[in-house]
Amino acid sequence: MENSTEVVSFVLAAYGHIGELKYLYFSLMLLWYLSVLTVNTVLIIVIYVDKKLHEPMYILLYNLFANQIGASTALYPLVMSQMFSDTHEVTLPWCFLQTYYLYICASVELCSLVAMAYDRYVAICCPLYYNVIMNTRQVGTLSVLVWMYPFINSVFSFSFVVPLKFCGNVIDKVFCDHYLIIKLACSVSVLNQVSDLLYAFSTIVIPFSLILISYMKILPVCLNTSEENRQKAVTTCTPQIVSVSSLFIGLIFHFSDSRFDVALVSDKVRIFLSLFLLICQPMGTPIMYGYKLPKIRQSWKRFLFDIK
């Protein structure tokens, strides 16, 4: 099979034969997806409605919650539709679109955490200049960069994938994966390999490095401040540190599953680990921030009470 026109769809082989369990899996996934949409939407509305939350940190959180909805929408509808498919086929355009969208969402997540880490750095290390540095224009610029940087990076990376000719169509996963798609190509140029490495560097290594630098600067200040200020710093920084750690673990699972031989791991465990990021993060993020940050916790309680 040397002609790329013969490959019109990819087969998601990780589903296997789930039999009657498809109804249980579908119900659980639908419930989880609706829960993710509800929780994140409520927090978005709370931040939008409550003027007390119109501060840099909460505006940046607004982007994070919106991205959780986008990432979940990129995954769950397709996965749920595949539950009732006998062939588990996905057309090339849809597969490319899902991969592109998922990679954008992962990058937006990291960029949002970078912006929030910078916000915490200014608030803790330069408190007297916080209102000057984190003004409305600066927050607006950060919000635009959070979305534009991933979009431009992904366009650049996928411009090398779309023209590829494919000699295989079986993807051993429950969703479309960028690296596994490239592996199915009849031939991969050095440019494709370099673009993949550059994409990983620009969307993962650089953001993680910036987050690490921010918290390395925050830590000495927290250690040399009063107990009250230290407690405030811990309260606002803990959800971000947990989010970054969870994201890091999820990315390790994702890339390990795509790039290494994991034959010793059972299929169910492997599927769960590859989905860890897209299952836990969309719900974990709103729970952590909605519960740990006092202002948001008070606001959504007032919001729910007023509705009732």
Q: Predicted segment positions?
A:
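Transmembrane helical core of 7TM receptor-like proteins
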Residues: 1-308
